[in-house]
Regions:
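A short, conserved alpha-helix in the catalytic core of glycosyltransferases
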Residues: 187, 191-192, 197-227
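Short beta-strand-to-loop acidic/aromatic patch adjacent to the donor-nucleotide binding site
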Residues: 107-116
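Conserved donor NDP-sugar-binding/catalytic core segment of glycosyltransferases
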Residues: 122-157
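A conserved acidic beta->alpha catalytic loop
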Residues: 60-69, 87, 117-118
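Short, well-formed alpha-helical segments that are part of the catalytic scaffolds
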Residues: 36-51
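Glycine-rich, basic loop-to-helix element that forms the pyrophosphate-binding segment
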Residues: 85-104
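Non-catalytic, C-terminal membrane-associated alpha-helical segments of glycosyltransferases
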Residues: 265-328
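A recurrent flexible, glycine/aromatic-enriched loop bordering the glycosyltransferase active site
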Residues: 166-183, 248
Length: 328
């Protein structure tokens, strides 16, 4: 991963993803934000996106009263709809609830967001312009265009794209992160909705793989920058090197381990796709042993996830406290 510092002034006016657009298209875009115990911090995500889209749907997964109070304030606006779940239904189920509402209201595009993400100014314009640019090139089967996520914890672009990579043109990818993904509504008619068996983690990868198999294509727009906080990362020293350890919690590791196996079994992925997944989870487990104070509990839950994956047990883990869960 290349260490790249994001600066808004790097973006040039003449790139393919920054051309002027008729603002009327915004009325056809519905943004979806999934929340869980975010409290007043929801305003960072909401304020960054509310003027870039026609409507915002917020799905809350059983948050505390402080978060619900903030959501009730936002719901006073005619351009905001809230869906309040009594418990944590997982990110896949929450996305599906909002997508079904938005499709019922006739929205043409769905923009999915995590509550700890912030859209940079003009991000949605750049995503839509990417669609327009690709259509002008004769590419009509664009299903998803994703933003370029910048991790505010590590100060790295998560996918390693330079802002000007590809001359500012949209780049084709196998998958993109769910937060910051602009999805054509008609895609759901062909491939169905987000996979609720996964509950959390790899929901975006599974969706994008099904998008590709449904005859659509997935792109990323490097200049559409999304500010994101990926977990609770801590910079640690290991001999002469430095590494980042993400304190996800034991329940998160259950889902990560289980869903990694699920992805490899379900999608029959090529070695070039599975190798990075296996390599990443192996490295992460080494970091658990080195840095996590609850290492044995975390490893036990990870083992439970592995066992459940091979037994075919999916969906939510019973009586799980999902406070630390985030989709990745």
């Amino acid at each position: 991963v290349r260490q790249l510092v994001w600066r808004e002034d790097v973006l040039s006016e003449g790139s393919p993803c920054t051309e002027a657009l008729d603002s009327s298209y915004r009325a056809r875009i519905c943004a979806v934000i999934v929340t869980y115990n975010i409290r007043e911090a929801i305003h960072r995500c909401f304020d960054s996106i509310q003027n870039q889209v026609g409507h915002v749907v917020i799905v809350d997964n059983g948050s505390d009263e402080f978060t619900r109070r903030e959501l009730n304030r936002l719901a006073a606006s005619d351009s905001v709809t809230t869906i309040l779940n009594e418990r944590n239904e997982g990110i896949a189920r929450a996305f599906n609830q909002a997508v079904q509402w938005a499709r019922g209201e006739g929205f043409q595009w769905i923009l999915t967001l995590d509550h700890d993400s912030e859209a940079t100014p003009g991000m949605v314009d750049k995503l839509v312009q990417a669609y327009v640019t690709l259509q002008r090139q004769g590419i009509q089967n664009v299903g998803v265009v994703g933003a370029n996520p910048f991790d505010q914890n590590t100060q790295l672009f998560i996918r390693g794209y330079h802002l000007r990579e590809g001359g500012g043109m949209p780049l084709e990818e196998g998958d993109v992160m769910s937060s910051g993904s602009l999805i054509q509504s008609r895609v759901f008619d062909v491939i169905g909705f987000f996979n609720e068996d996964l509950f959390v983690y790899y929901v975006d990868v599974d969706f994008c793989l099904r998008v590709g198999r449904g005859g659509f294509r997935v792109f990323v727009c490097p200049e559409a920058v999304l500010l994101h906080k990926e977990g609770s990362k801590e910079r640690r020293k290991f001999f002469w090197r430095h590494a980042y350890y993400d304190h996800r919690g034991k329940h998160a590791w259950y889902y990560l381990t289980r869903n990694t196996i699920y992805m490899m079994k379900k999608h029959d992925l090529s070695p070039s796709y599975t190798y990075p997944m296996v390599r990443r989870i192996c490295k992460d487990h080494v970091k658990i042993l080195l840095y996590d104070k609850e290492r044995f509990s975390v490893l036990w839950f990870s083992l439970k996830g592995l066992i459940d994956a091979f037994r075919g047990r999916f969906g939510p883990l019973n009586s799980v406290n999902t406070t630390t869960l985030r989709d990745g």
